[in-house]
């Protein structure tokens, strides 16, 4: 894509990577479903949680774009979607300003949530912002040392699902824990396919992801097991009489198995970007099925 004017609206939209907002929406959606079934759902804090999640996702996208560019990780042989700074669509100076804006807006949204969740939400919000930077920035970028999967489990599982529920219910229970775990595992499939696709370039750049450390075959197996484990987590909901929350998510395994087989056939190269799209679709299917299962 060459017809992108530097620092234009189009450039910022591309840098924001709106397709990644699915991963931000699913945990909040599940937290809202849990609040609904326990009789605590409130529209205003729910909308604020969605807004905070979207702003933090865009913030993280900007941060990763800038610091991967500064570290030289976005090489010419990059297989994934084009990055704004590396392509010259957005200058490093402008991206820093963009990061400041999204961080500020997320902070303001977080302050609004304090009215519902209480002061205990302050350290959670601060942690979200700090780890958004530490993922690719700083002297020990966590994504470069194999911590990405754990961070996804925490910040796309327990934090957004649990805190969305908490700001409405001021409570935490085992249903929240299991939904958070399932959500974190399912969203980690997206990181796993990213790392599987980029394994050769990551090894050259010194990015020691789990796939780089354990190898491509292990990455393929882990990709499948993450989805399977997420479905297993749903069996907990039998304890609260939510049979549909057990059965409906199992339908996710059909596209997940097909995508895993497709991934194994392609194995390397830019064609794996198609698997990225399939994984995002499957992830949304799981989130919608579990949400529906909880509400029914």
What are these regions (language model features)?
Residues 76-116, 210-241, 280-286:
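Multi-pass membrane catalytic core of lipid/isoprenoid biosynthesis enzymes
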Residues 83-171:
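Intramembrane alpha-helical segments
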Residues 239-296:
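Extended hydrophobic alpha-helices typical of membrane-associated regions
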Residues 1-44, 48, 140:
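Topogenic membrane-insertion module of multi-pass membrane proteins
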Residues 55-79, 189-211:
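Acidic (Asp/Glu-rich) catalytic motifs at the cytosolic membrane interface
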Residues 26-31, 150-165, 183, 211-216, ...:
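Small-residue-rich segments of transmembrane alpha-helices in multi-pass membrane proteins
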Residues 152-199, 217-220:
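Functional transmembrane core segments of multi-pass inner-membrane proteins
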Residues 29, 38-66, 122-130, 174-193:
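Membrane-embedded alpha-helical segments that form the functional core of polytopic membrane enzymes
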